[in-house]
């Protein structure tokens, strides 16, 4: 499974570079946004000179707070886009696993299940062509999946497609990705 570890490390390294690029961009946008908001604040103060000093200060604080909220939202959106990009890259890499890593994945999936010897393994077209009609003592199904594998035992299908696994674990993966990239 070391190739999967290398794959994860490479993806995280690329994601970190992308995160840094996005953060620099967002910081520049935030600075410009804050400068524009400060100009708006100054105009508002000049327009309401007849109001008391407390009202002007209160308005300034609300505008700054609003700018900070918008800034925070921009950063959150950039992080969300980064996570989506990392997950998309991960899915593409998983779809292109070499046959040894793919077999390791299928074997691990089989180890976690209590299935009968009559179960069938549903593979990707590419791996079905490479691996043949039987693996690990189980028949390879005529059906195919887009990525990963499914295991059919009677009327029960165990979904181990990579896209489904990533979606199922998305919240945990998001936390882990953001933790690895941003500390």
Swiss-Prot record:
InterPro entries: ATPase_V1_Esu. The lineage of its organism: Bacteria, Fusobacteriati, Fusobacteriota, Fusobacteriia, Fusobacteriales. Keywords: ATP synthesis, Hydrogen ion transport, Ion transport, Transport. Belongs to the V-ATPase E subunit family. It comes from the Bacteria. Pfam families: vATP-synt_E. One of its GO terms (molecular function) is ATP binding. Produces ATP from ADP in the presence of a proton gradient across the membrane. One of its GO terms (cellular component) is proton-transporting two-sector ATPase complex, catalytic domain. GO terms for biological process: proton motive force-driven plasma membrane ATP synthesis. This is V-type ATP synthase subunit E.
